[in-house]
Amino acid sequence: MYSTVRTAVLDGISAIPVQVEVDISTGMPVFDMVGNLTSEVREAKERVKTALHSVGIILPAKRITVNLSPANIKKTGTGFDLPIAVAILTAMGVIDADSIKDCTLAGELNLNGEILPVSGILPIVFDEYNKGIGKFIIPKQNENEGRLVCGAKIFGISHLNDVIAQFDETAFTCQKTGMAHELQMDEKYADFCDVNGQKFIKRACEVAAGGMHNILLVGPPGAGKTMIAERMPSILPPLSENERLELSKIYSICGLLDNDSSLRDSRPFRNPHYSVTQAALIGGGTRINPGEISLAHNGVLFLDELAEFKGGLLDLLRAPLEEHCIRLSRAGRNVTYPANFLLFGAMNPCSCGYYPDMQRCRCSEPTLRRYFDKVSQPIIDRIDICVEASPLSFEDINSTTSNESSADIRKRVMHCHELQKERFKGESFSYNSKISTDKLEKYCFLGSREKSYMENMFDKLGLTARTYHKILKVARTIADLDGCENIKTKHLNEAICYRSINEKFWGGAVS
């Protein structure tokens, strides 16, 4: 007696088809499972046997062999419980094989036969549907998540008896839920109109959002660094449908997708504490789950108290900041997760927080140097905009002048993004911050006057090639925000202002 059932295993945010084969033959009574399995998958044998017994199914006293194919792919997770149980029931003749034909199953089994939810249902249903599979049997608690895929026929079950009961095509829920709908900005984001003063910082944030430039704020406690960072997502454009789907897949894998029959509409804002572990920040663990940098995909990763992060942890961001993804390896498995985020860093200017106010700062010169050395130069080199947040004055705190709202700023940022979208058609990048070095001259062209200005500033400030390129990219964004086709001297001058802090706090050139 032989049967096969289709399921899938996650590989990053994609799903790879897996065939669960069951053979029941004469021989010594034994239950074997093969197919490159992790311990949690091998444990399915006991869960399946007990669950079947709890619903009155007695396994035959024969040799039962379960194979999860292909064998070259590591099988991990608890979503194989249900497919294995159904494959056994089909081989025993309890379930009609035709009823699960062209169907993908996933779900974890309780010992009493209850079907428990599993993570990653959205990428499984999406990828399997695109491979031509139209029907899906998944846990009831994952039903809304499965219905996010337009056209997929989802059957949510809560108990093994639901599968054993005979059903046909009409038993499937055929509701087609389109993913596209009018997006609304998430009201949970605070508004920039609440921020008094700090006009220079707010302008820097607008430029950062306009070109998706990484930004660092350095300033004393109470300068409003965290308050400003929390408002950064409110000036970013809404997610595109592809961005929403990709982000929702990541949250589905982590079990964080809201069970409300909708994809994630808002850009994420992740704010991990500086005590975060390596696995929590970049991803990893036994199942190689996504980390904070992937949960911040297409959104903002806010790292407060940047200098307090554990030694070497920040340097792990160097590759993701360049490649916009993270490659993780563990126990023979290699997984890649998206990690295209806007890095927003914030830190005090010294250990006590009051440098360069020498009347209040208690730090010695060696202490200052050790403090800034906690943030390596390679990380600073990957941050386009570094600005100083000055303490708020009494007038700023008590100002009754109305401030510009996030909605007004977002309009300019969205127009800036539209210009870049049109400009970079056919390119591998979409934003000014991502312009490759070989395309800088094409997209950041300087006239003779502007080139002469930058030549003078290059020698005067001792710029490096890397810094020069960053200034050009930021200047391109400033020009876009101002509605200028070409980069002007004023745009270059403003871009240089967003790098001058490096000389003050890291010593040396504006690099």
Task: Describe each region flagged by the PLM.
Residues 217-258, 323:
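Walker A/P-loop
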Residues 298, 304-305, 316:
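Walker B catalytic acidic pair
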Residues 171-207, 211, 238-293:
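P-loop NTPase nucleotide-binding/switch module
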Residues 111, 301-302, 308-309:
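Residues immediately C-terminal
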Residues 34-45, 60, 67-77, 287-288, ...:
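Basic, amphipathic alpha-helical bundle interface domains used for macromolecular binding and assembly
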Residues 1-216, 220-226, 329, 467-468, ...:
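Peripheral, non-AAA+ core regions of ATP-driven protein-machinery
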Residues 59-62, 99-100, 130-132, 150, ...:
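Short loop/turn elements that form and flank the Walker-type P-loop nucleotide-binding site
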